[in-house]
Design a protein with these regions (language model features):
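Positively charged n-region of N-terminal signal peptides that target proteins for export
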Residues: 1-4
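Bacterial N-terminal signal peptides
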Residues: 7-16
Length: 502
């Protein structure tokens, strides 16, 4: 008999390795037993290219095999795998977990039959024999980062720097933390591939630290670490048992949206309303993932979320997407919420509408699986509901940003406004953000220094993206804003031109 756990993003108990001094980033000592070595050889024969052996994954697999031998109801459930990985000091975000039960002499053949021929860079096998039956767990992981040593246990109030290097082809690492109370913190990142990010652990409890990186398929989780502060448990809080998966797709999607809104409610946020046009975009991407057999934000047959929304004529200011895969739609959503960066998307304060799409499929092993896409959007803001004009709101946003930066306020300049307005009209006509000699025309007003920022935005407040607002050399500013639909950038866009001079 074989069972497969396939949670992915796009994630008798053995004692943890010694708490004091236990660090991620160092492979612990764990030599495979004779039975484990035979099973591992079957893995290396089945998976090509043959994965390397990870002692940390071996230890985690042994804990899970012991759970299976003891009669645990769901021995390789996602939460159990996550806790076993933490106890074994493995930072793999979502390894595939396969459970095989067979007579000891039949283990290699049973393992070979059970594996779905995935790709993997590292593997670990754990085996426990009980009453003539071998319980074998195989963990297969695609590693995306190499971490420097980082503590698994810290004191409340401790600080530590997470550092490491992304593996090719990944870049632009960014680190997120979910605090014990559910707050998500964006701790910063780097252009990559090397990174070093200082982290703080202000209180006791279970912290989840995540490294997200940009890959060929968009952002992916590169590493996931559980850090216990003040002696906290490495196990995640128990979740309420999910209801059986509804047979029809729409009901499953509605259940995920309800779960998403329940999480928002626990954090004091208003619910997002169902948006059928967004759900249609989400469902098509879930189907594309199922057809490709992989979890990713970008696929050859399905571009990034922004392009998909624009192609469907859906106006939005900002869009946030989660993708995941698991045995059921709610399990996939729970896997997404276990990721700090994905949870941050669920908790976006400006999001007001959302669409959920799923696609059911079967893994190579024959096990059923569900591909999930969640898209939350912030509405566009053309300024129509404000007593201020879009131009005035852009100036107001620039004033606020200058004050936040501790810089002198900018003076509005009517001559510069006229130049910026003409530039914005020109951009809308050509459907292309370009400066078109605007800085030279500003210098023609007998100014010594000029710079220009132009962009297409979903609202006046997006003007804080203006790169030159932080330059203390500038004292005057001109703003031009024109609203309209764009074939390239979507509906209800604002073309914004900002020109700065001394």
């Amino acid at each position: 008999m074989a069972r497969l756990s396939s949670a992915a993003l796009v994630l008798a108990v053995l004692p943890a390795l010694a708490g004091a001094g236990a660090e991620y980033g160092r492979e612990p000592a764990a030599a495979p037993t004779r039975l484990e070595a035979r099973a591992l050889e079957a893995v290396r024969t089945r998976v090509r290219p043959a994965p390397g052996t990870s002692p940390a994954l071996v230890l985690a697999a042994r804990e899970l095999a012991a759970r299976a031998a003891s009669g645990a109801r769901e021995p390789i459930a996602r939460a159990a795998v996550r806790a076993a990985l933490a106890r074994a000091l493995a930072s793999d975000p979502s390894p595939a977990a396969v459970l095989v039960e067979a007579a000891p002499d039949e283990v290699p053949a049973a393992v070979a039959r059970a594996l779905p021929r995935p790709s993997a860079t590292h593997a670990g096998v754990g085996a426990v024999e009980r009453d003539g039956t071998a319980f074998v767990v195989v963990l297969l992981s695609e590693r995306r980062a190499r971490l420097d040593p980082f503590p698994r246990e810290v004191a409340p109030g401790a600080q530590a720097a997470l550092s490491g290097t992304l593996l090719a082809p990944f870049s632009r690492p960014r680190v997120f933390i979910t605090r014990p109370g559910g707050e998500v913190v964006d701790a910063g990142g780097a252009a990559g591939p090397a990174f070093r990010v200082p982290l703080e652990f202000p209180g006791a409890g279970r912290h989840v630290v995540e490294v997200v990186a940009e890959g060929e398929g968009g952002p992916e989780v590169a590493a996931l670490l559980t850090v216990a502060a003040g002696g906290a448990s490495l196990d995640a809080p128990a979740r309420t048992a999910a209801a059986p998966e509804p047979a029809d797709r729409s009901s499953s999607e509605a259940g995920v949206l309800a779960a998403l809104n329940a999480t928002r409610a626990r954090h004091g946020l208003a619910p997002v309303t169902a948006a059928p046009e967004v759900a249609a975009v989400a469902r098509r991407h879930a189907e594309a993932m199922a057809a490709a057999g992989r979890v990713a934000h970008v696929l050859p047959a399905s571009p990034d979320a922004g392009a998909r929304l624009r192609g469907a004529g859906v106006p939005y200011r900002r869009a946030y997407e989660n993708v995941a895969r698991a045995g059921t739609a709610l399990e996939a959503h729970a896997a997404a919420e276990d990721s700090p960066a994905h949870l941050a998307n669920v908790l976006r304060t400006g999001a007001t509408r959302a669409g959920v799409g799923i696609a059911r499929a079967r893994l190579a092993s024959g096990d059923p699986t569900v591909y999930l896409t969640e898209i939350l959007i912030e509405p566009t803001d053309d300024g129509a509901a404000s007593p201020l004009t879009p131009d005035a709101r852009v100036r107001e946003a620039l004033w606020r940003e200058r004050a936040r930066l501790g810089l002198a306020p900018l003076t509005a300049d009517a001559a510069l406004d006229a130049l910026a307005r003409d530039a914005a009209e020109h951009m809308r006509t050509r459907d292309e953000p370009e400066t078109d000699g605007l800085a030279d025309r500003a210098l023609g007003l007998r100014r010594r220094l000029a710079a220009v920022d132009v962009f297409v935005a979903g609202g006046p407040d997006d003007a804080v993206r203006s790169a030159n607002v932080k330059d203390a050399r500038f004292a005057r500013v001109g703003v031009g804003v024109v609203a309209g639909d764009s074939a390239r950038f979507g509906k209800a866009r604002l073309w914004i031109a900002v020109v700065y001079t001394d």
